[in-house]
Amino acid sequence: IERVRTVLRKETPGFEPVDVRGLVGEALKHAGHLSEVVDVKTVFPDEEVLVKGDALELELVVVNFLKNAVRAVADLPSRSSIVVEVLCQNEIVEVSVLDEGPAVSDEVFGALGKLTKSVSKEGLGFGLFIASSIAEMHRGHLAFARRTPQGLKASLVLPRLRELNINNQEWKHEAGAFDSHR
């Protein structure tokens, strides 16, 4: 509860280097029994990918994406796939969950990431709003894209941590340096 309050107040907790591949692995473990419902494919770069942040909070964003993707494909007549991919482009890390669910309306698509009524009967409408707040606290954002012929791509976009100098506790990434919160 305190973590959620921190997120909603937009306070910055103590951040550490986070291995994104490990973070995705933990999210897959905590997202429930995905393999019973869908086929899950992961796409990771060969090199280590680090971001500066709170691993648990970032994991919550990915778990939210995974659960939303499973809900989107749960009622499809045939078994569906979800792809979890980590892409690095210079100073940016993008963690995405791609599903093959039905197309979403313009109204629903426009409301993604905002505080709104949930389209799911189990949901409260807070999930993506909280995920968006977490992304912003980590100097990132959420991005959504429709897939063709159907489906959705939900992405967490964060600055990439390139170099860590432990002696003076400075964190560096492609776009510059910023002090740690220790």
What feature does the model see in each segment?
Residues 9-13, 50-53:
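Conserved micro-motifs of the catalytic ATP-binding
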Residues 104-116, 171-172:
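Short conserved segment of the HATPase_c
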Residues 127, 131:
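Short alpha-helical Gxxx[C/S/T] motif in the catalytic ATP-binding
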Residues 39-49:
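Conserved catalytic submotifs in the C-terminal HATPase_c
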Residues 135-136:
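Detector for a conserved hydrophobic position within an alpha-helical segment of the HATPase_c
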Residues 79-91:
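Short beta-strand/loop element within the Bergerat-fold HATPase_c
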Residues 14-28:
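A conserved beta-strand-to-alpha-helix junction within the catalytic ATP-binding
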